[in-house]
Amino acid sequence: MIIDFASHFMTKEVAEKLSTKDNFNRLQKNFIPESSDPEFRIALMRKYGYDMQVLTQSTPILSGLKADEAAEICRISNDVIGKICLWYPDRFIPFVVVSLLDVRSAVNELDRAVKEWGCRGVTIGTNHGNRGLDDPQNAPFFERVCEHDIPVFLHPMDWHSYPLAEDDPGIMRLFGWPFDTTLAILRLVLSGTMERYPTLKIVTHHLGGGMFPFFAHRFEIKLPNLKHKLKKPLSESLNRIYGDTAVDGTAAALPCGHAFFGTDRMLFGTDYPFSPENGEVYLRENLDIIKKWNLPEADKAKILGGNAIKLLKLEMIMAR
């Protein structure tokens, strides 16, 4: 079973709604209209041997929007993705997307999407305006996520206070986004957010942003010198953080990520459709590096789909 945990879905309705927004116009060149067609996706899945995709709305399209605008975009996206997943339940898995610019609205939308569409997870950005994820205002959101017992998928965002976001957005996406993911994890751990919500599960894009696995021991060594004091062992927080394997086909990243996450907390992902050849490069190369990886076949099976089945509680779907 091969499940793509990091497959982005941009609806045509959202693209039309955002067509006048400067930030979206910069991102639009990566938008492949055909990827909004479920039959087009299924044809590619058959071509490369994929069984299912988790459909997630990429959060950078929310950058620069006001709270009410972001909430509307989320509702539109959630309804389209929800319907597609109902039409193709054996192919697509729905994730709700919310904006934490308005936490009450985010909680209401989370409830609605889980009830109406059976969403198996929730996608959020790594920062919201000038607030990090550890901001106390976000507490109701994390409480409700734990009540629903679904994972949170973190997608990096631009920093509008940092000149790279405006001067060279390509550089920001290349290395700024992975660092933003790393910083978001760090803040969730050091703030005690992971401790306060012992059932909270976080899935990080791009293997934890790359930096966290690479500097994991540095973090452990420097932790006693930080002002933040954890009540429980660090491992109790880190053991509920997962990483997807959407590393743009970079095989060398996998052993490093595996040393940090272990087999059971790695989830296969591609970052489709944001690659050359209308997204096919990532579909092909991200799968290829897993198949060629010098890892036991049983471990590969977990990473490619077994872990996603367990995390998203898909056993009943698999039993059909």
Language-model features: where?
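Catalytic metal-binding/acid-base residues of hydrolase active sites
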Residues: H8, N127, M157-D158, G208, ...
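Active-site gating loops and adjacent loop-to-helix segments of metal-dependent hydrolytic enzymes
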Residues: H8-S35, H160-F179, E220-R240
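Acidic-and-aromatic substrate-binding clefts and catalytic sites of carbohydrate-active enzymes
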Residues: F31-S36, L62-S63, L100-A106, G129-P136, ...
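Mid-to-C-terminal alpha-helical segments outside catalytic/metal-binding sites
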Residues: M1-F5, F9-M52, D79-W87, N108-R112, ...
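Aromatic-lined glycan-binding groove of carbohydrate-active enzymes
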Residues: V189-M194, P198-E236
